[in-house]
Amino acid sequence: MERLELVVASSIGADLAMAFLTGTKQPIGHVFFDGGQFAQIAKGTGRVMTPFLYIAIKSLYWSKGGTLKKILWCDDDSIKLYFIAASENLTYTNLRRQILDSLEDKPFPSLPEELQKHIYFEFGSIEDHFKYRQAVIEAYPCGNYPVFEGYDHMQYQIRDPKGFAEMLTYIAAHDGMPKLPFIRK
């Protein structure tokens, strides 16, 4: 493989993508991050919240998805089975490691200015994580920061996966965001 044209990362999986981006010698064309993964918490907070989050996530399996709306902003049938399966397979140890590794309040890793110009950090205007947008802008001043007006965390990709895929294709082909009615800069 000579080049990766597009790297896409959402939620906590973005930490893996960021580790890849900071460690690879592979040329990267474009990167799209869903903004929610940039939440940062103190280590102690992560330790305290892990058992509660574990029970909340496991409840998705125990209730056959009945608690999804209480945990996430939506309970679409299209995603319910995914969350049920994920919660069934979740272990406490894996969740603890993921929280402690992913949401730690530490400086964002540095990225080359040229790569930043081709990175898109999307935030939904009504998601809780929107408050972290300014910190990401300060860490990566050359990046692109579209706001999905009226959208919550990952809502566009869940509600319109085809439209989301077309948007990503456009980014890779045209080095920019398509004109979508809900996007503001």
Per-range role (PLM):
Residues T22-S59:
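Flexible "cap/lid" loop of the alpha/beta hydrolase fold
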Residues K43-G44, L60-E113:
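Conserved alpha/beta-hydrolase catalytic His-Asp/Glu region
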Residues V8-A17:
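Gly/Ala-rich beta-loop-alpha elbow adjacent to hydrolase catalytic centers
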Residues G176-K185:
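Alpha/beta-hydrolase-fold serine-hydrolase catalytic core, especially in secreted/extracellular enzymes
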Residues Y140-M154:
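Catalytic histidine neighborhood in serine/cysteine hydrolases
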Residues R97-A139, Y156:
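Conserved serine/cysteine hydrolase catalytic core
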